[in-house]
Amino acid sequence: INGEVVAENQKSKLKSQKAGTVNKFSCSPKVEEDFKTEFAGEKEIPVIQALDGQLITNRLDLVPKADNGKIVSDTENDVLKIVVVNRYQEAPVAKAFIKGFGLKQGALASSVAHDSHNIVAVGVDEESLCRAVNLVIAEQGGLSAVGNGRELVLGLPVAGLMSNGDGYEIAEAYTRLDQFTKKDLGSTLTSPFMTLSFMALLVIPHLKLSDKGLFDGDVF
């Protein structure tokens, strides 16, 4: 009754309307030093164990790999650095270590990081982490991967979570990122960016990383 035809012959009759993008990115580019972790003689450190296809994680307590007074990634044992960068204000980078991503080189970063949607990144070294995070900051949100002499980034200008671009083009760009992360960087996860996006979600056990540091859901 008094209806309006909005689609016909598989084509929309609705007029497109442009809207401004909503976003908030108030962090400046980082430097490599921001991602370094001091070694204080720890015998063991808490390590997040990411599980393929799962939102939960396990806690492992492992012997850290130290080099020149710093705790560094141990790619031979798949213990990599994970960081969370506060995107809403200037703050120190939160750092920890994670097992299960399988990266042999480079880093990946994302501003899709439930629920606060800060920037979360995993990488084999501080230089790669810095590059990946700064790509996301430059785009004011998105997904990035660096390594093997290449840099890939998918900008997500709407709140750092979504794109206002063509859906098919965005899907192709995401597929390229996903394949690059697995084939070039060596990730063994089915969906590296999906797993990454839940590593800062504290309400799902057991060990996660927020912009304030590690959070153990079993003992808080």
Positions of the model-derived regions?
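Active-site microenvironment of metallo-dependent hydrolases
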Residues: 1-220
